[in-house]
């Protein structure tokens, strides 16, 4: 019986700990490395450095990312040259835990751009500054808890369609303000009031954007059969917000719900991500009435070679009729940079659009994955133009009644060399449709990007 007990205990002792590098590095948890027997990675000695008191330690980490980008006919030919440039990202963080009730997290960022014709965009370059620097007070090691966080921080919720750290571009998005995180039963709830951080090309000179205020409440919980639901409210107050109809002060209230099931990892199964949003508020002396619905439905065959996943996205968001007193243009607020895959920072965004987006993914041996997709896009309202991913106007309607914007086939190859390093290549062509041919030079966008990254 004694030997049986030892055998039963072995799986518990050999339990594999989570060594995931999260999108938000503040969510990395290396406390299990307090046990020296768990230390097996080269970087483990700096992942848990005890500070002498109970539950007191500091953890260090970082990231290096190099990207070669080439864009031909940017903005469908408004810039006809082939623009080739290099983007470099360097990030370093430290996470101090003082007991179970106090935590200080600081993350430095440096984004550098070289060789781009026209110079760096705001998303390309930030010489050196704090990406995050916050103090958190409260104990999360309870069944129900609440903690207060104040300082510079990142926000990322749900699928990232509306609130994201802007991971694709070279410089990530951060905010200055306060946030309360809480757990009540099965609900995880966040509430915040912040201002976006303005990235200026220089050293430690970022400031909050005092023309914009952003606040919200986001709640999520598991439901049943691997399905979870999110409910949220987002508030945005912007001075001089710009749309095709003009510029004015914008007060926008966003109410949304999301139902989702993650991609299958063990047994063959379907996955989905459905999200519906309405937006109300005021724009100048008029009102705001906007909406969107987004869907992503897939199936993963985990029991066949290459573990393929086939999926299709279908999305729609409202556009504007400038002749009415009500602004109908949907705002993506702070969206994910690569929601449409390749062409993330140069193609059209999820504003005034209808799209169908089939995709295929497969897992090859030795950590290599491949994907291929096609995005086909139309305008929802022919009186409104085409907008970029962040929501600013790219091509005005210019009287065109054509609805078809174009289509973009693309492909991606990624080699996850080990848990730290990866190489990736993206390629896409956006073929201009009838609207772009009528309202712009209408040339096809060619896009190539090569990535190399390392996290620790």
Q: Residue locations for each model-derived region?
A:
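Signature for the C-terminal beta-barrel architecture of outer-membrane proteins
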Residues: 141-148, 161-323, 383, 395-411, ...
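Predominantly the C-terminal beta-signal and adjacent terminal strand-loop region
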Residues: 418-451, 455-456
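Extracellular/periplasmic loop regions
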Residues: 16-40, 276, 286-399
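Residues on the lipid-exposed face of transmembrane beta-strands in outer-membrane beta-barrel proteins
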Residues: 62, 92-96, 132-137, 178-182, ...
């Amino acid at each position: 019986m004694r030997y049986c007990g030892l055998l039963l205990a072995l799986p518990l002792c050999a339990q594999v700990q989570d060594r995931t590098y999260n999108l938000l590095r503040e969510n990395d948890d290396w406390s299990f490395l307090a046990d020296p027997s768990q230390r097996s990675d080269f970087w483990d000695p700096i992942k848990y450095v005890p500070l002498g008191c109970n539950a007191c330690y500091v953890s260090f980490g970082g990231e290096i990312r190099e990207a070669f980008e080439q864009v031909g006919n940017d903005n469908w030919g408004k810039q006809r040259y082939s623009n080739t440039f290099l983007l470099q990202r360097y990030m370093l963080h430290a996470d101090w835990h003082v007991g179970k009730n106090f935590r200080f997290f600081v993350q430095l960022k440096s984004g550098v751009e070289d060789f781009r014709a026209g110079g760096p965009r705001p998303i390309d370059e930030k010489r050196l500054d704090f990406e995050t620097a916050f103090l958190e007070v409260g104990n999360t090691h309870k069944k129900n808890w609440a903690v207060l966080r104040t300082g510079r921080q990142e926000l990322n919720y749900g699928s990232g369609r509306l609130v994201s750290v802007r991971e694709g571009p070279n410089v990530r998005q951060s905010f200055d303000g306060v946030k309360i995180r809480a757990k009540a039963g099965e609900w995880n709830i966040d509430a915040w009031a912040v201002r976006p951080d303005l990235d200026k090309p220089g050293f430690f000179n970022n400031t909050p954007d005092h023309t914009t205020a952003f606040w919200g409440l986001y709640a999520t919980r598991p439901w049943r059969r691997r399905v979870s639901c999110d409910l949220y409210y987002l508030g945005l107050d912007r001075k001089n917000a710009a749309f095709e109809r003009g510029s004015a002060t914008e007060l926008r209230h966003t109410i949304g719900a999301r139902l989702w099931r993650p991609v299958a990892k063990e047994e063959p199964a379907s996955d989905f991500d459905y999200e519906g949003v309405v937006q109300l508020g005021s724009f100048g002396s008029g009102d705001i009435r906007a909406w969107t619905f987004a869907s992503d439905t897939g199936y993963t065959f985990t029991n066949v070679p290459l573990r393929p996943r086939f999926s299709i996205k279908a999305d729609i968001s409202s556009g504007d009729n400038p002749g009415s007193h009500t602004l109908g243009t949907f705002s993506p607020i702070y969206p994910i940079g690569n929601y449409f895959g390749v062409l993330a920072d140069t193609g059209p965004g999820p504003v005034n659009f209808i799209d169908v987006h089939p995709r295929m993914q497969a897992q090859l041996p030795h950590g290599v994955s491949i994907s291929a997709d096609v995005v086909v896009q139309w305008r929802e309202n022919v009186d409104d133009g085409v907008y970029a991913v962040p929501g600013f106007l790219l091509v005005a309607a210019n009287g065109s009644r054509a609805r078809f914007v174009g289509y973009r086939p693309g492909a991606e190859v990624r080699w996850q060399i080990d848990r730290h390093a990866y190489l990736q290549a993206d390629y896409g062509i956006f073929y201009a449709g009838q609207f772009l041919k009528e309202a712009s030079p209408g040339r096809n966008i060619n896009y190539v990007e090569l990535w190399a990254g390392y996290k620790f």
